[in-house]
C-alpha cells in the first residue's frame, strides 16, 4: 500500500513532512510536489489521502493523465472532500477548459477551508500553463521538489519490497537488475 511509512524519503524528508502536514492539518500550507518520473509523487499523494482518512478527514485522489474524456468535467466533479490530491497537473497544460476548472477548484477549496495537494513532473514555474492566474496560484504554494533516490537507497527499496514477499535479494541479483 502507498502509505507514508512505506515511502523511502532519502533526501526528501522535508518534502514528505510538508505533504503529510497538508493532509492531516487543515491549517497547514498547501503543497505542490514536483519530481521526475519514479520519484514518488503519486505514492506521496495517495499516502496523503490515506493519512487524511486516518485523521478523520475525507479525501479524494485525481490522476489527470489517466483520464479519458473531459478532464475539465472530472476536475469540476471533485467536490465535497476535506483533501483533494491532484496528480499530473502538467497533463492539462494548454487545455483551456481544464485549466479554468482547476483554477475554479483551487478557489472553491480555499474558500471552503479545505486542503489541496498537487503533483507534476515539473515545478509550476516550468509548466506551460496558459492561464496566468492558475500559474500564479500554483506557484504560490509550498514547493516540494523531489530528488531521485541514490542507487544505494534504490537497492534498499528493492530489498524491502522483496522481503515483504518473502524473497531475499543478494548483491549479485541487484547488480544484474541495475545493469539491465
Language-model features, listed with the residues they occupy:
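Short conserved motifs of the RecA-like P-loop NTPase core
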Residues: 168-180
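Dynamic helix-loop-helix/coil hinge segments at AAA+ ATPase domain boundaries and subdomain interfaces
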Residues: 1-16
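Short regulatory helix/loop adjacent to the ATP-binding pocket of P-loop NTPases
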Residues: 124-139
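AAA+/P-loop NTPase substrate/partner-engagement loops
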Residues: 54-82
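Conserved AAA+ ATPase "sensor/coupling" helix adjacent to the nucleotide-binding pocket
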Residues: 141, 155-168
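Conserved nucleotide-sensing/catalytic segment adjacent to the nucleotide-binding pocket
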Residues: 74-119
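Walker A/P-loop nucleotide-binding motif
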Residues: 27-45
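Conserved AAA+ ATPase "SRH/arginine-finger" region at the nucleotide-binding site
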Residues: 141-153
Amino acid at each position: 500500500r502507498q502509505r507514508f511509512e512505506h515511502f523511502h524519503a532519502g533526501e526528501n524528508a522535508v518534502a514528505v513532512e510538508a505533504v503529510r502536514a497538508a493532509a492531516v492539518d487543515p491549517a497547514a500550507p498547501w503543497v505542490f510536489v514536483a519530481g521526475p518520473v519514479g520519484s514518488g509523487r503519486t505514492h506521496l499523494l495517495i499516502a496523503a489521502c490515506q493519512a487524511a482518512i486516518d485523521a478523520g478527514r475525507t479525501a479524494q485522489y485525481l490522476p489527470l493523465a489517466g483520464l479519458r474524456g473531459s478532464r475539465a468535467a472530472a476536475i469540476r466533479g471533485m467536490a465535497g472532500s476535506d483533501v483533494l490530491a491532484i496528480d499530473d497537473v502538467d497533463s492539462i497544460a494548454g487545455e483551456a477548459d481544464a485549466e479554468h476548472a482547476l483554477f475554479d477548484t483551487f478557489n472553491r477549496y480555499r474558500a471552503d477551508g479545505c486542503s489541496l495537494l498537487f503533483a507534476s513532473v515539473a515545478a509550476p514555474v516550468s509548466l506551460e500553463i496558459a492561464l496566468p492566474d492558475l500559474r500564479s496560484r500554483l506557484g504560490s504554494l509550498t514547493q516540494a521538489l523531489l530528488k531521485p533516490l541514490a542507487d544505494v537507497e534504490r537497492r534498499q527499496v528493492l530489498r524491502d519490497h522483496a522481503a515483504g514477499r518473502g524473497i531475499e535479494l543478494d548483491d549479485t541479483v541487484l547488480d544484474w537488475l541495475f545493469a539491465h
